[in-house]
Amino acid sequence: MANVESMIVEEKTQVKQIDREKTCPMLLRVFCSTGRHHSVSEYMFGNVPTNELQIYTWQDATLHELTSLVRDVNPDTRKKGTYFDFAVVYPNFRSNHFQMREIGVTCTGQKGIDDNKTLAQAKFSIGDFLDISITPPNRLPPTARRQRPY
């Protein structure tokens, strides 16, 4: 009987390099909350949560880069060990509702596997929102997410 081997290969999608000098940035609407994500119902019927942060950036922006931008405007998040759990809030046109999909976690002062993930790799589309759950270092970090097939 022959031995059977299997290998799990994680393929990284190639991100097309954007010339930030020649390409106009997009408006990224970011909503931060401490300890949890906003409820999807807060994005319904043209409403959004009140604590909006507007960032002009490009599709090749990494989660680490976005973490740095949020830390620049929010001094409470600069402490080492602060977790940033990113999620994309996007419209589901079939059901006329919004849905939320977690895309990665970063931590201040620590390197992580999601640090170099870009908005393009997370399948972010212009018009989507970015919802960030910020967990201070004195609380437990976000629980491990189950692996999703997308």
Curated annotation (Swiss-Prot):
Pfam families: SAP18. GO terms for molecular function: DNA-binding transcription factor binding; transcription corepressor activity. Its main location: nucleus. GO terms for cellular component: cytoplasm; nucleus. It is found in: Nucleus; Cytoplasm. Keywords: Cytoplasm, Developmental protein, Nucleus, Repressor, Transcription, Transcription regulation. GO terms for biological process: heterochromatin formation; negative regulation of DNA-templated transcription. It comes from the Eukaryota. Forms a complex with SIN3 and histone deacetylase. Interacts with the N-terminal residues of TRL. Interacts with BCD; in vitro and yeast cells. Belongs to the SAP18 family. Involved in the tethering of the SIN3 complex to core histone proteins. Interacts with bicoid (bcd) to repress transcription of bicoid target genes in the anterior tip of the embryo; a process known as retraction. Interacts with Trl and binds to Polycomb response elements at the bithorax complex. May contribute to the regulation of other homeotic gene expressions. This is Histone deacetylase complex subunit SAP18. The gene is Bin1.
